[in-house]
Amino acid sequence: MAFLEDGNHTAVTEFILVGLTDDPVLKVILFTIILCIYLVTVSGNLSTILLIRVSSQLHHPMYFFLSHLASVDLGYSSSVTPNMLINFLAENNTISYIGCSIQFGSATFFGVLECFLLAVMAYDRFVAICNPLLYSIKMSTQVCVKLVVGSYIGSSLNASFVTVSIFNLLFCGPNKINHFFCDFDPLIELSCSDVSVPVAVTSCSAGLITMITVFVIAVSYTYILITVLKMRSTEGRHKAFSTCTSHLTAVTLFYGTVTFIYVMPKSNYSTDQNKVVSVFYMVVIPMLNPLIYSLRNNEIKGALKRQLGKKIFSQSNILFCKS
C-alpha cells in the first residue's frame, strides 16, 4: 500500500525508485559492474582498516585518520549500493518511507563526515610539514581523538537536522523518485508542502560545511606549498609532495563531483547526468580511495609486505612442524 489517508490528505507510505535504467540487458550489465566495484570497495577498505590496526609502524595520526576515512567510505557506499543492486534484479523498486529516511540520513551523515575528515587530514599534513618539531604535541593522541569525535558529532547533528526537516514535509503523491536512491532534490520535487524553508536551511548548511572544509584544505595546502618551496633539499621536497599527492587526489575527486551536483545550477545538467555523477562519488570513489592512498605510499606497501611475510612464515612453520 503506497498511500495512507491522513485527515484531508493522502500520505505516502512508500516510494518507487526509478533507478538508472529500464533496459533489462543494461540492468544485468550494471548489476555485474557495480557488484564487482562494491566487493572491491568492501575488501579494499576493510584491508586498510585492519592493516593500520595490526601494523605498529602505521600507528601515526595520518593513518589513524585514514582508517576512519576508510570506515566512512565503506559506510557511504553501503548506504546506497546494496539497495541499488537489489533494485537491478527486482521488478518493483520500492522503498518504505522509513527506509527512505534512513537511507537519506545515512548518505548525508557519511557525506558530511567525509568532508570533515578530508579537512582534518589536510590540517594534519600542514602540521607535519610546516611544524614538524611540534607535530607530536599538536597532533597528540588526545587531539586526534577530539578531531575525529568532533567530526562524527558534527556530521550526526547535521544529518539529523536535515533529515528531520525534509521528512517532516507532507508527501501526498506522486511517489516516484527519479533517482537510484533517496536524494535531496528528487524528494523535494515530490513534496506537496511549502519547501522554501527546508531548501533554504539545507542549502545554507551544505554551503557552510563545504566552504569551511574547503577553506581549511586550501589554507593548509597554501602554507604547505610555501614551506616546500623554501626547502633546499630536492629529496625533502619530493618526500613532502609525495605525502600530499594522495590526499589532494582524493579531495579533488570528491569535491569535484559534489560541486557538480550540489553547487552548480540545476539548469546546467540533466537528471541522467546527475545520476551518473552520483554513481561516481557514492560508488566509485569509495573504491578508489584505498588504491589512491596505498599505491603511492611506501609505508603502507611496506607494512602490507611485512604482514604477508609473517603470514607466509607462520604457515610454513606449521607445515614444517606437521611434517
From Swiss-Prot:
Membrane spanning stretches: 29-49, 58-78, 103-123, 137-157, 200-220, 241-261, 275-295
Membrane topology: Multi-pass membrane protein
Pfam family, one: 7tm_4
GO CC annotation, single: membrane
Family annotation (InterPro entries): GPCR_Rhodpsn (IPR000276), GPCR_Rhodpsn_7TM (IPR017452), Olfact_rcpt (IPR000725)
GO molecular function, one term: olfactory receptor activity
Primary location recorded for the protein, binned into one broad class: membrane
GO biological process: G protein-coupled receptor signaling pathway; sensory perception of smell
Entry's localization field: Cell membrane
Cysteines engaged in disulfide bonds, as pairs: C100-C192
Keyword terms: Cell membrane, Disulfide bond, G-protein coupled receptor, Glycoprotein, Membrane, Olfaction, Receptor, Sensory transduction, Transducer, Transmembrane, Transmembrane helix
Record topology, Cytoplasmic segments: 50-57, 124-136, 221-240, 296-323
Residue ranges, Extracellular side: 1-28, 79-102, 158-199, 262-274
Similarity section: Belongs to the G-protein coupled receptor 1 family.
Protein name: Olfactory receptor 5P58
Organism the protein comes from: Mus musculus
Lineage: Eukaryota, Metazoa, Chordata, Craniata, Vertebrata
Gene field: Or5p58
